[in-house]
Amino acid sequence: MALRPRFWKCLSVCRKLECGFAALSTSSVPAVQPDVESKENEAVAPEFTNRNPRNLELLGVARKERGWATVWPNREFWHRLRVVKTQHHVEAFVEHLNGQVVVSASTREWAIKKHLYSTRNVVACESIGRVLAQRCLEAGINFMVYQPTPWEASSDSIKRLQNAMTESGVMLREPRRIYE
């Protein structure tokens, strides 16, 4: 009960000074903080749960769908590069095994389109390769499969896209799966 009159007295003093709300300390001795126990940080949990969904892929142990050897395109991959060339644009994207598009780049994007003379020529394909490779490396995708059709494989623009991706550090072959 003794604190209430002091509080209102201090508040009334502050109102007169027009300083807003302020609190005054009743003790002149600072509170002493106890030392922190550092032994808690040394304890290691007996079980470790890795929550990275791509961990098994990076180790080469994750399942790949098998039994699609007679079907084209082959479905034995973790990530697949797909290139779509339309009448006016070039689009490349990386597809995961479950069908989701992980990373993409297209000449329809204004950030890429404004630097190109044409959105369909060989230079556009090379630029798309560089941009997609940079985005893949930022996303942590270093390996992927690319299976071009025979008429696409002989194309200069597709060759330049492949060269741009490999020069940027992305391997267009996935490591073999470890069966143990």
From Swiss-Prot:
Checking CDD domains in the record gives: Ribosomal_L18_L5e
Q: Which GO terms describe its biological process?
A: mitochondrial translation; rRNA import into mitochondrion
Known Gene3D superfamilies for this protein? Ribosomal protein S11
Keywords noted in UniProt: Chaperone, Mitochondrion, Ribonucleoprotein, Ribosomal protein, RNA-binding, Transit peptide, Transport
User: Which coarse location class applies to the principal site listed for this UniProt protein?
Assistant: mitochondrion
What the entry lists under Pfam families is as follows:
Ribosomal_L18p
A GO cellular component annotated for this chain's UniProt record is:
mitochondrial inner membrane
Q: Where found, per UniProt?
A: Mitochondrion
Q: Which GO terms describe its molecular function?
A: 5S rRNA binding; structural constituent of ribosome
Task: Describe its partners and assembly state.
Answer: Component of the mitochondrial ribosome large subunit (39S) which comprises a 16S rRNA and about 50 distinct proteins.
Q: Which PANTHER family match?
A: 39S RIBOSOMAL PROTEIN L18, MITOCHONDRIAL (PTHR12899), LARGE RIBOSOMAL SUBUNIT PROTEIN UL18M (PTHR12899:SF3)
Known function: Together with thiosulfate sulfurtransferase (TST), acts as a mitochondrial import factor for the cytosolic 5S rRNA. The precursor form shows RNA chaperone activity; is able to fold the 5S rRNA into an import-competent conformation that is recognized by rhodanese (TST). Both the cytoplasmic and mitochondrial forms are able to bind to the helix IV-loop D in the gamma domain of the 5S rRNA.
What name does this protein carry? Large ribosomal subunit protein uL18m
Source organism of the structure: Mus musculus
Gene responsible for this protein: Mrpl18
